[in-house]
């Protein structure tokens, strides 16, 4: 099963992000936009795992989350991975407070014990809004995004994180919650 660990977004933030997607979509060429129920803040992409590892993984995540506090989150501004003419991913930025940095670091410390690998790049918290198809020219899209660089999508406090399964379907990926882990253990 294909899995990832994420912070779930409040409905108000999803609504604001969906409105931004609707504003940007007319400027986009060959972009697959995320639906509201697919929007999340990824902390760790695990990829394919055996179901037999879930109890051990859940135990480790419970341990990590129990030792950490809730995480203040602030989604604001738009950006992209790739270059201006040919972006690969369109995203909303999320600030990196110390609590989120500790959560991300603590998770990966445990995940490495299970053999998972991470990019050693700096963690760049973001919410993926859309993925551009190969060779799509989207200069007009990135120009339109320039007007929304400081747009606010919401502030909230993440009190838990979720282990999800990503199951492909003909209508796109379906994200299934496998387990929630309370931050602070309360």
What does each model-identified segment do?
Residues 1-186:
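Histidine-dependent nucleotide/RNA phosphoesterase domain, centered on the 2H-phosphoesterase fold
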């Amino acid at each position: 099963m294909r899995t990832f660990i994420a912070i779930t977004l409040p409905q108000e933030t999803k609504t604001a992000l969906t409105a931004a997607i609707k504003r940007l979509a007319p400027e986009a060429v060959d972009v697959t936009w995320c639906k509201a129920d697919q929007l999340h803040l990824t902390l760790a992409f695990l990829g394919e795992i055996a179901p037999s590892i879930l109890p051990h993984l859940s135990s480790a995540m419970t341990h990590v989350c129990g030792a950490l506090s809730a995480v203040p989150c602030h989604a604001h501004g738009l950006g992209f991975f790739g270059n201006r003419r040919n972006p690969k991913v369109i995203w909303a930025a999320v600030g990196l407070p110390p609590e989120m940095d500790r959560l991300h670091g603590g998770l990966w410390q445990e995940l490495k014990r299970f053999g998972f690998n991470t990019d050693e790049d700096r963690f760049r918290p973001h919410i993926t809004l859309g993925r551009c198809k190969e060779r799509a020219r989207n200069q007009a899209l990135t120009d339109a995004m320039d007007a929304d660089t400081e747009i606010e999508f919401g502030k909230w406090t993440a009190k838990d994180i979720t282990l999800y399964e990503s199951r492909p379907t003909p209508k796109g990926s379906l994200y299934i919650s496998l387990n929630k882990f309370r931050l602070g253990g309360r």
